[in-house]
């Protein structure tokens, strides 16, 4: 518990890691989702979150997370059809259980970053929620298919926030 202006505030339960680049087409999908989802959350829902914009996911974003704090990575994914939404647990991504999993559009795939955190003994409970992207060129906006899927992407993120917070 944390004391703020005389009020006792519970610590956040979910670290929301918002990945992507706004100037790289569909790579900015998670930024758009967060920018439109967060203001629509209730005060109670917002207090559950610690939000970090990470651009490219790094193992430092996960190492040292306090016990009880779950991770939620949102990012665009390649390797899944454009506009398709995927939600995979960190454990499943690390295990590489043979299922086709998304890869971040960044240099180091999400599964490898999670694997590093696991090797260091710091893999938190958590989920990756991605949306398949189509174009990633500099200066491009979101593709039509990603824009059309944005409401469902925000809904999937909210479902995971609520699930991980319990």
Where do the language-model regions lie?
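N-terminal catalytic or cofactor-binding beta/alpha core of small enzyme domains
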Residues: 2-123, 128-133, 140-152, 158-166
């Amino acid at each position: 518990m944390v004391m703020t202006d005389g009020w006792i505030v519970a610590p956040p339960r979910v670290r929301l890691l918002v990945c992507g680049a706004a100037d790289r087409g569909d790579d900015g999908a998670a930024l758009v989702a967060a920018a439109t989802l967060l203001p629509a959350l209730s005060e109670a829902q917002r207090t559950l979150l610690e939000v970090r914009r990470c651009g490219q996911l790094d193992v430092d974003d996960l190492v040292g997370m306090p016990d009880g704090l779950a991770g939620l990575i949102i990012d665009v994914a390649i390797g899944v059809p454009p506009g398709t939404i995927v939600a995979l647990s960190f454990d499943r991504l690390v295990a590489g259980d043979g299922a086709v999993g998304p890869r971040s559009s960044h240099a180091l795939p999400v599964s490898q970053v999670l694997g590093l955190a696991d090797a260091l003994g710091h893999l938190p409970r958590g989920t990756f929620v991605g949306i398949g992207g189509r174009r990633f060129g500099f200066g491009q906006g979101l593709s039509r298919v990603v824009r059309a899927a944005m409401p469902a992407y925000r809904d999937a993120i909210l479902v995971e926030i609520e699930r991980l917070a319990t």
